[in-house]
Amino acid sequence: NRPCVTIPDDHDIGQGNLWGESGKKSMRKDGNDGGYYFHPEYVKMVERAQTAHLPDAYHQAPLEQGIKAYFTSLKIGGVDFAIIEDRKFKSGPNGKIPRQGPRADHINDPNYNPESINLPELVLLGDLQHQFLEEWGSDRSSQMKAVLSATGFCGGAHLHGKASNRLHADLDSNGWPQHGRNKALDLIQKAGAVHIAGDQHLPTVIHHGIEAF
């Protein structure tokens, strides 16, 4: 008898990580070239199972391979929730940025230049969700606003086991691409919203910066 919001994440559709690139087909099982590796009907089935109870999606037209968007808003008990898809439109790193670690999405060089991977053509949320958040943020009819997403807008977890395995950038996190991350946080800030996300394995409270860190 309690409302429940579920957001499909990478493991739900059979991938270790997901950079959806608007629903395109990935040619790699690890998915880091961007897109979905498994059959689109399977992807759509998973998303129906986990999001069919949500309000109608903001964007109704199908994306690539017929995969649909589900990002939407939901008002419960005086709180206006924006439910966004931070994986579905995101660019995959493989072949788009210089490789600086053991994997296309892992950078372990402490001297790397963040601007070398912050390329303007790379996408995080994309124009459709920027438009949605602009409109949602301008509605002040609720007591409180909150944004829900699959993962956070930073690399909150840096260690994968030993200290020698520290990642200086994990491109699965929404800290990348940085310009997309900054745009998302700017829209969340303008809305006066808090942000609640999953995925990073460790409970973390983060105070984000946009101009200063």
Short names for language-model regions:
Residues N1-F213:
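Long, structured stretches of catalytic cores involved in phosphate-ester chemistry, encompassing
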